[in-house]
Amino acid sequence: MTGWNQLRLQRPLAAWACWSRVLRDNPNDSAAKQALEALLKAPHLPHAARAVYRFRMPSIPIRRARWNAVLLARDQEDLDAAADVFAQLMAADPEDADAAFNHALCLAWLGHNADALAALDRVVRLDAATRPDQAAAAWVVAEVLRQGAGAERFADEWSHTLVMPRHSRDDLWIAQLEEAGRLRRFATPLRPDTLEPVATDLQVYELLDRALTEVGEPTSGYGDPDSTPPPPPSRPARVMCSVLVQPNELRFSSPDPESLRRVETFLPMLRPDASCRPVQRLSSPLPLNMLDAAAWLTRLPVGLPEDQRRRLAQEALDDYYRNTWIHQPRQGLEGLTPALAAESSDPVIRVRLDAILTFREQVDARSPVGWPLEIHHDFDDLRRRLQARRPDATPRLDQPHLKTQATPPELDRSEPQ
């Protein structure tokens, strides 16, 4: 499988390994060089998704001797062979967290995300109490892998969709909502290769919880079961869902399942027969460049001064993390919410919380897709609220080639990590 295919499957570590192997065999391959450079500099990916990872080296002499004996007898040029070597070392010493981490890296480079997650879980359980920084660094990698193809059942960030048949009478409520300012239309997305619309019969909208008006204009709404008196025009609107209108179907999508439930309650008020139509419910992991999509559902009134726009956007972002995100259960925390994980005395849970905050900070630090303001949440404040710590270990972005070899001389020269 090519690097680009791996990247489309949300497996950036496997994509990096593909291109790095090409460069190992042919250092002058310009296509691989450009692809690798594009990945390492991708502005919309979190740091951990484009970092370069290295094998860990054992710090205990008896383990170093065991590693040297096993590595001397095996070919390390092949990732499958390298994975087998570290599996053998793990079998010989079940407490060897470094072998487990290296095994996880090999599996991740091969695109076996689910198996790599299991190996990283083992690393965290071995290292949490005695080497929390190394354990947290391992779990940051796990946060990348859980969103990739093959590990869907472990994902924590999802896009939820309702699909229902379209009737010709739907045009009426679509027009009414658009006129009321509750439904905003966008240009049809373009194909990246041809720059042509992905479809000529596709209409793309955002459904807002209130009208997005000019400052100073009255707001208007349209029968919502949760409707309230018209808010001040400076109050932001919130996206309930995106709406794709196609000739034969309607698709309502949101990263926020609660918003989508409101939409499902809202639809029968627009079209009484909506509750009688067959509804298909779909969910898929969010891509790595949109993991915080639920944090960016605020839409600001038109015509606000720049300082007021920035203040309102910052308040909405901070409110999301402080009052919504921390109360959402996560598989990465064994089903706990960050708020409940903060109360745990289990070192494994504590390390995972540290890692998830580190990864989420990286997600927040990159350029959000389609958002005009450069604002970020203060994750140190969130750490204080959750009594979490900032791990010292961070992956590097400056290494251009894959290191699948760990020969005995290298091990002897390497400093323990």
Give the residues covered by each predicted segment.
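"A position-specific structural signal for the A-helix of alpha-solenoid helical repeats
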Residues: M1, A35, R64-N68, N102, ...
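TPR alpha-solenoid repeat register
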Residues: A31-A32, A99, D133
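Short Lys/Arg-enriched alpha/beta "domain-start" segment
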Residues: E143-S234
